[in-house]
Structures are given as C-alpha cells and as structure tokens.
C-alpha cells in the first residue's frame, strides 16, 4: 500500500507517564471485582474500557496506526501490576495488548485491514496449529475449531493458527491467519478452576476465506524477520522474535498473581489472631516463625521472578535494536534464554503462592479469599505449555548439552 498515513512515525518527545503508573490509578476497580470476573467467566466491558482509557492497548501498537510504539518491558511490568489486582483481567489484557505488537509483524495491508476500519480493534488468538488450511485462489480456507482463544468475547479479530499446505517440494508450514469476528462463532467450552475469567472459549470456523496478505508464518515470526518488521525497519520493537514477547506477557500474569497474593496475605495475617486449640487461642499469627518464613520465601520468590522476567524482555528488545543497527545478531541461544526466564519466573511464582496458600487455614478456603484465587490462577498459568518448566527446562538442558532443543523458541 502507498498510503503515507501508515508510514513509520518518529518517537514522541512529550513527557511520558509510564503505563505501570497509569495501571495503579485503576487497579482498585479490578481488585474489587476479581471474584465477579471469575464467576462471570469473562472480563467485563467496563474493564476493557478502563484499560483503553489509560492507553493499555496502545503501548506496543505501532505509531503508524495510532499506537505508542513503546517498550515491551513496559507492558510486561504493567501487566504484573494489573495481574496482582485480577489475574484473569491481566491475562486477557496482556494478550490483547501484545497482539497489537503481533499484528504489526503482518504485512502492512493486513494491519490496515484491521486498524483502518476500527482503530480500537483488538485481537484474540488460538496458537496451536492443529488444523490444515486449504489452498484457495488468492489465499486459504479454514474450517474447524480453535480452542483456548483467551479474550475472544472482547476481540474483533482472531489469530487462528493452522498448517499451510506445502509449496512445490517444500514442507507444510505453521502460520497465523487473521480472521474477523464476523466470520466465526464462539462455543462455550471454558469451565475451569483457574483463570476462569479469561473467556478462553473455542472459535468455530466454517469454510472461511483468508487472503494471503493476512498470513504470517511461524518461522518468520519466531525469527523476528517478518513482513511487518521490514516495514518498521528502524524499530527494534517490531523485529523482536515472537516468543521473546508473547510468553513474557503470559508469565507476567503468574508473577502478578503471586505478588497480589503476597500483599493480601500480609494484610490479612498482620491483624489475625488465632482461635484454634492446636495453635493456641489469642496468639498473633504474625508472631509465628513459620508464618514469618513463608512471607520471606514468598517475597524473595516474587522479587526474583520480577527481576528475571523484566531483565530478559528488556534484553530481547535491546538486542533486536542492535541487530537492526548491525551490532549484533539474535541467536537461537538468545531466544532460548528468553524462554528459560519466562518459564522459570512462573516457577518462582508457584513457589510463592504455594508457601502462602498452605498456611491460610480454614478461612483460606473461602472463594472470596484472594490468596486461594491467586494460587489457582498462578497454577493455571503454570499449566500453559509455554510456561511449563518440565517442557521448557528440558529444552534448555538439551541445548546446553549439545543436543537439538525440541520445543518452541
């Protein structure tokens, strides 16, 4: 396309209020309604509107289409704080915002298809390429079901992963295909114990045509060498490999859930007096050494998780910019380091919520208790294949031992 309104824009020079500070101003809304979000099994429209009002979905959206083109680490840091208030809202909002960055990897024409019609459009996604796309004149056709489409009821488009048929003597290639919400139905399949409010339902497509310009292959996305990256050739943000970014947002929800659990636990235990006969009545919980140790362990775990996650995503964006300037290259080892940090930060988060939840007593079983909710939500994050340490850790070990790493990086 030749529309100069889409030309890459220079960075803004006006004073910048960091996104994490803007989240702090609205966090109480999400915290006070976390149980209602869980019970409704979706993030309410009022939450999306509040986040839109503070520019949450613009932070890593390209300036050429009205976004801020900011730092990915800034989104991850803000999403930790948002998830501390409500993990379901953080999971959905983090993905919806990060998908603005992912859309920027597509050809400019695809970006215009989405944002020219609706500058506020948001995208959900279903990442497992379990269906085969059928070749058609000028594109592909999709039919079938795409599960785990988090935030699908809050989105106007979806990124549906599928296998493209091989070209000539080539091999089948996994890819994302952009589909508008008007061309799929949503099947209610999300009835779960953790992250219940993420509306991660199933998309149903029936012979949907997707033009070729709305396709982004996995090899391009995971390497960081994408059509959109070439369009934004001077912006390191849009040349980061896919899996240095998206899983960092997923991990931030687990880290944030643990951070929120710690704050709630300290607030509750600080004024709690025991009633039980075993522990002895009328004793302050805060004076028990075991409680003190659990608080210390959780705090150290949360701090370590934050440090690892934020360090690695900042390193990834800096390295991408250095690659554009010819000063460095983004190697497989660099991509694996990002995957290691993302997953291990969630492992630390699980350690934190386990230490806290194990000592909440009978009152901790109540569904209104934020610690038990954070424990369930953080464990749900840890079940995601991108965060599962058994899957990611073995991949890292394979590489360190001279073997080919088996997994997504």
From Swiss-Prot:
Induction: Induced in the presence of gamma-resorcylate.
SUPFAM superfamilies: Acyl-CoA dehydrogenase C-terminal domain-like, Acyl-CoA dehydrogenase NM domain-like
Pathway: Aromatic compound metabolism
Molecular function via GO: acyl-CoA dehydrogenase activity; flavin adenine dinucleotide binding; monooxygenase activity
EC number: 1.14.14.27
Subunit comment: The FADH(2)-dependent resorcinol hydroxylase is composed of two subunits, GraA (the oxygenase component) and GraD (the reductase component). Both subunits are required for activity.
Entry similarity comment: Belongs to the HpaH/HsaA monooxygenase family.
PANTHER family in the cross-refs: ACYL-COA DEHYDROGENASE, ISOVALERYL-COA DEHYDROGENASE, MITOCHONDRIAL-RELATED
Name this protein carries in UniProt: FADH(2)-dependent resorcinol hydroxylase, oxygenase component
Gene label: graA
